[in-house]
Amino acid sequence: HAAEFAAENPDVTLIQLSSFGCGLDAITTDQVRSVLEDHWRIYTMLKLDEVSNLGAARIRLRSLLAALARRQPPAFEPEGFTDRPHFTRECKAQHTILAPQLAPIHFALFETVLRKYGYRVVIPPTPERKDIDVGLEYVNNDMCYPAIVIIGQLLAELRSGKYDPDNTSIMLFQTCGACRATNYMAVLRRALAAAGFPQVPVFAFHGIETDAFRMTKPMLCDAAKASVLADTLMTCRNRVLPYEKNPGDARRMFDHWLEICRKTIEGGSGREYRRTIREMVAAFDAMPLRDIPRKPRVGVVGEILVKYHPLANNHLEEELEGEGAEVIMPLFTDFFLYLACDNIIRHDLLDGKLSAKIASKIFISVLEYFRKPARKALERSSRFEAPCSIYEMMRLASRHVSLGNMAGEGWFLTAEMVRLIDSGVMNIVCLQPFGCLPNHITGKGVIHLLRESYPGANIVPIDCDSGSSEVNQLNRLKLMLTVAREENRRKAESEEEERSGQHSA
C-alpha cells in the first residue's frame, strides 16, 4: 500500500528499510520495486542489522536526494492491468505440464498418477549445479534456498529448448501458510517474465490458485497409494542397502519394485495394491544380507525439499552411506498428515472452525486407511519398523514445543527428531535452508533441549544454501559418525562384559 501511495503521488518518495535475515523482506522488496519501477519512480532500499555502518546509508540517501533534484517529475500514464496467464481446460489437452523435482522416489510415482488422469506431466530428473545458478540469476538471492532450486530447475528446463513455451504450463504445490513457500508462485511468475516466458501459466496442485486443475477423489486415492508405496519402498531399500551380501542386489530389487509400483498405480485394484505391498516387503525381508553388527543409524530430518532433494542437500544420503551409515529417512506421507493437522490445532488452540477440523480428521483417516496394509506388512517383517500415527507424533512434539508452531515444518520437525530418538536412532542430521526462520526455531532451537532430555542424542544441524561448502558439511558428518561409532563400540564392550559376567556366574 505504501508503494502504491508513493507511486501515485509524484511529490512522495519511498525508502524501504529491510532487516538482514528477514525472510519476508525478500518478497516485499521485489514487489515494492516492481510497483515503483512500473510507475517510473526511483526505488531505494536500505538493509540494516545490529552492526550496520550508517555511513553507507548516508551515501545512499545523499545520492537519492541528488537524483531527485536533477530528475524531472515522471509523466506517467497508467496502462490497463494485464491479468496473469491461467491454466484452462484447453491447456490440459494441449500443454506439457512441468513440475519441479523434490523427492525422486515419490515424484516418480506422483508423475504416474497425474498422467493416468490425462495430465501430460513431466518431472525433470535431479537438476545439476548450473541450474541453481539460473535460479540465482532470476530470484532474489535473499529468498530461501528451496525457491532458488525449484525455480532455477524449471527455468533451465524451459531454456533448454525441449519445450514449447506457448504450450507449456508449470505446476507447484502451494502451502498457504506462514512459510515463504506460499509465495513461490508469485516469485516464479516474476522470474518467468524476466527470463522471457511471461506467457507460461503457473497453477497450484493444491492451494489457492489451482485454476482449472481439479483434484478428484479417485486421483486423491491414487496419490495416497503412490505416497505409501514410495515410503515403503524407500524404507525397505534403506534398511538392506548397507548390509547387502551381493553388491547391487538392493539397487536391482529397488528398480524392479519401483516398476511394479508404477504398474499397480496405472491399472491396479485395491487388492493388487495390498498384494504389491505385502510381496515387496516380503522380498526385501528375504534378501540375503551380511551377518555383521548393525551400522550406526543416522536419521535425516528438516525442511522437506532439502531433506529429500539430492542436489539441495549435496547428496547427503549417498555421503552417509559411503561413510558406513544406515540412513533413516522419515516418511513423506507424514508431511501431508502434518499439514492436515493445522485445522485441528487451529480449532483446539486458536479460532479455527469445527467443520475444518472434522474435514481434516476425515482426510487423515483416508490416508491412514491406505497406509494400513503397509503398517501390517512392516509389523510382520523381521527387519522393518512400522510407522506411527500422526496423533502419536503430535503427542511426542507437545513434550517440547507448542503445537501452535505451524509455520514451515513447525512442530512436525521436533516430532520427527523425538520419534527417531525414541526408536533408538540417536544420530540425527537436521537440515534447514539458510535463513529459514520457522525451522531454525523448531529445528536448531530445540536441539539443546533435546540433548538435555536425551543425553545420548548426537544431533548435527546443517544449513543448506547455494554457497554452502560441501567440504565443511562432509567434515561435520564425519565428526558425527566418529562419535556414533565410538558409542556403538562402547555399547558393544558393555554388552560383552555383561555376557562374560553372566557366564562366570
Segments from the language model and where they lie:
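An N-terminal assembly and electron-transfer interface module characteristic of large anaerobic redox
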Residues: 1-505
